[in-house]
Amino acid sequence: MSHLSDAGFWDLVHIARRPIVASHSNARAVCPHRRNLTDDQFRAIRDSGGVVGLNLYLHFVGQPTMDALVAHVEHFLALDGEKTLCLGGDLDGCEALAAGMTGMQDVPKLYEALKARGYSDALLEDIFWNNLRRLI
């Protein structure tokens, strides 16, 4: 789903018989890139029981800050995405990651940023591990 056009997305939603996965997508409301998901697209994935993997690629985050990356998380959580959001990364072939990240070794920085904003360990474990594990 992460590489589909809007029309292709909805075509697939109408024929999907299993949970839908957008393996590396962010919120278009936060960063208006055509590859990011609209709120309606996120809800369709959520309602299917699927997952959306947070994309760390700078051009889909919008700004090179941790706050910009966290804004995508908070937007999806505001759409009742606690059991939908997971990590997607899109680390292969990317020349620039958000928030000064250089690779997987920096993902704990996102965990710490969310923890500092008051998110519970249980919610963060869902986002960082359980939501994707539930699906696979």
What are these regions (language model features)?
Residues 1, 11, 86-88, 125-129:
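Beta-strand segments within the central parallel beta-sheet cores of soluble alpha/beta enzyme folds
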Residues 24, 52, 90, 124:
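Conserved, mostly hydrophobic/aromatic
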Residues 4-6, 25-28, 57-59, 90-94:
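Active-site beta-loop-alpha junctions enriched in small/polar residues
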Residues 56, 80-104:
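Short acidic/histidine-rich active-site segments
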Residues 1-21, 34-49, 68-83:
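Histidine/acidic residue-rich metal-binding segments in metalloenzymes
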Residues 33-37, 64-68, 98-105:
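Alpha-helix N-cap and loop-to-helix initiation/capping positions
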Residues 46, 51-61:
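A conserved active-site cap/scaffold subdomain adjacent to cofactor or substrate pockets
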Residues 102-136:
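Mid-to-C-terminal alpha-helical segments outside catalytic/metal-binding sites
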